[in-house]
Amino acid sequence: VKIMLEKLRISLIFINLVLLKSLSLNRRMHNLYTKFVRILEICKQFSNNLVNDQGNIVRCGPVPKFSDLEVVALSLAAESESIDSEKWLFDYKLQEYKEQIPNLISRRQFNDRRKKTAGLCEAIRKRIALKMDGGEDFFLVDSKPVEVCRLARGKRCKMGQTGDFSKAPDFGYCASQNTYYFGYKLHAVCGLSGVVHSYDLSKASVHDLNYMKDIKLEYHNCSIYGDKGYIGADVQLDLFETAHIRLECPSYQVYILFVLMA
């Protein structure tokens, strides 16, 4: 425990230094196009064997002028600017950069291709996370509520009723906020430096313990710490025997350090 606390303390110091450096660099990334270009460069560095020389996923048909990597980069750049409206993004924001992005596709094409490149985006994200935080032996798992509508409107919400019911939102309870909500539950596993390595969505009513059943497919020879909702004797034994994963509930002091770091 002493070794782990010391490692957490050092990591907190390192994160503060990185954060200060990032804030100083962000002054130069003052517009959407600058972020788009920078993110595109990063995507190219981590897309080896994922796309061809033109930056597209190999497939039949005409070669798009606006590459798949550019679709991913534009999507991430918009997220970094907290832009959640595609209409506003294409009708207003991107009009400023018509000359810089001559091959820009339409909003409908962007919407369709962003769905098709979701797997590419996730693969690049995992490679970046591994590069930033690849040698970790300690991880933290936690969840947070994702509310899709107000509790009173939950029974009238039609989301997910026409498809797979297991993926539809549901009523759930958040113990940390002591409140009920309607929506999903976001589970995430991060390392000591705060880098998210994996995540998943579940119905709000699904117990946290169910998320740990599939985690052995991605992790091995490590320690994972979570609150009591993720701890179960059967799951702990299974994870240790199959993947040498030590699943534990940390002391309050260690848990607070994890939360501050993330």
Task: Go through the PLM ranges and name each one.
Residues K2-A262:
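Short alpha-helical elements
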